Amino acid sequence: EKYLTGMTPKKILRRPGPSTQPDWGQNLPPILQRLYAARGVTSDEQLSYTLKRLASPMELRGIDRAVQLLATAIFEKQSVMILGDFDADGATSTAVAMVGLGMMGLERVDFRVPSRFADGYGLTPGIIERLRDEGELPDLLVTVDNGIAAVDGVRVAKELGVSIVVTDHHLAGEVLPDADAIVNPNQPGCPFLSKNAAGVGVMFYVLTALRKHLREINQLPDPQPNLGSLLDLVALGTVADVVPLDHNNRIFVEQGLRRIRQGEARPGILALLEVAGRDHQEISSTDLGFVVGPRLNAAGRLDDMSVGIACLLADSRDEALRLARELDTFNRERRTIEKDMKAQAQDLLASMSLDLEGLPWGLALFDTDWHQGVIGI
């Protein structure tokens, strides 16, 4: 085996199917039996994508404490800041948090998204210090799709008197941030079965647990929050983040697609489909991943993801279309930049003198002028 010098080798391992196969009977074609086995499907229940099949939110470690903090923020009219991420999962997570918490009666809620170029990823000390300098420090800060690695950012925030709820899905490091609550299926000791949840799915679960708590203490606002109306956003973030579609995630995607096809999606999602020339009644998960997702991601790649979040939060078709067209323009520009960078890389490769017998499995090319927001595609 050959690897590039200085790189850590990674092996691609086959995942064997279950040792025992269920008896599907003679009505199921062999090809479907093989496909089901490859995806770990062993029962009819796993082919049911109704919402009642979702795993319980109460299995998520830390969710009780997160709910307590959010409920207190509602009752005491505290200020809450949602700190998102600059990709599609981060944008949909932010939108779900903004809309969902508003449904629950939270009056003082706003969001911030780090700049890919000025701030880097996640909750950093610099972001907290800027909020302090601008007089925008919240009572409670909620991270979505980030935060599990923000040890220093959380420390600085707490030193300034800010309570922190981390909601994330990324793998935890050796040291966890000293947040007031952490909700992450991949944190140590969390029994939640769906380790493949996207950030938007984790935030959705926090909202379902919060609604359950408010219902139990007779504090749900009227009309009662319909969290099902957020499933179009959950489906979009789940597909766009390319997380494995386990049974739980398939439920999210199936239910979200149903809402979109029925025209019951957020105006921003319908507008993004419209500017791309797609009929919302005919869409599939492919459209979320390759049509809507890239247009949303383009904002964070080239400019500021706040534009993408504003599109998802837009209440009117006109406002959503205006922002969707702006995102479409960003995406066209992103394609041009990507095409030019690829051509430059191919020209650079063609100009190199290579020993064809001693080539490694891959070559990495670098140019300081290549766009940092596009280089990772």
PLM feature spans:
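N-terminal amphipathic/basic-hydrophobic helices that include classical n-h-c signal peptides
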Residues: 1-6
